[in-house]
Amino acid sequence: LGCERGLLVAGPFFFKSGLAEKVIKESEGMIVASFGDVSPNPDVAEVDACAEVIRQKNIGFVVALGGGSPMDCAKAAASVALTSDSIRKYHGIGVAMPEKHLPLIAVPTTAGTGSEVTCVSVLSDHANGKKAPIVSEGFYPAAAIIDPELTYTMPPQVTAGTGIDVLSHAIEGYWSKGHQPICDVLAMHAAELVFKYVYRAYRKPDDEEAREKMCEASLIAGLAFTLPKTTSSHACSFPLTN
């Protein structure tokens, strides 16, 4: 990417387990700061805090490690940090994000959200009881690194939950009013993979083929719904998970 001074954004587990420290060490000085205050449904306050780290540390690129929450937080922070704004200005009110953004490298550790290939960041504003997506062309990661081995340690309930999320993305992308033939093909392929492999991954976490195919399904489902967008199921989930 030709950038220096990276920021690692990851969930608290990665810092407690030592994995975040290992990633920073392996970067050989390219990653100079980290941010780990990311909750399962990232809050706008967390995005603003992450953006402030980017500003203060003169960050040139961002690495997001984890599930959809760190990736969504990093996407929004990497854009809003180049302004003096709070992300609240753009959250759920239809105000377009600025086009300028820092490069983002997404490294998913779950097979579920597909956030590594989408232009969407789903954020909560717990203080105001609101959860909504922000869509911006600047949210597309510059690179996505998909390593199925990173998903081996997912607990069975997380494997199941994220697997159903993949299926939901595929189905909603297919039945959305904005669907089109290419997205339909991707959606059907992703759904087929989920039906075939999610139970295997649930029952046997180290099943290499099942984990690889679920990562494939997650990425492809992300591509499938990016253009047509998700529908009623996700809309209903926002107040339930806020």
What is each stretch, according to the model?
Residues 45-146:
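Glycine/threonine-rich beta-strand-loop-alpha-helix active-site module
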Residues 120-228:
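Carboxylate- and glycine-rich phosphate/diphosphate-binding segment that chelates Mg2+/Mn2+
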Residues 238-242:
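Catalytic phosphate/nucleotide-handling subdomain of diverse soluble enzymes
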Residues 15-85, 200-211:
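N-terminal small/polar loop signature for handling phosphorylated ligands or for N-terminal nucleophile
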Residues 230-237:
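Conserved catalytic block of serine-dependent lipid acyl chemistry
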Residues 1-7:
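N-terminal, positively charged, Ser/Thr/Ala/Gly-biased leader segments
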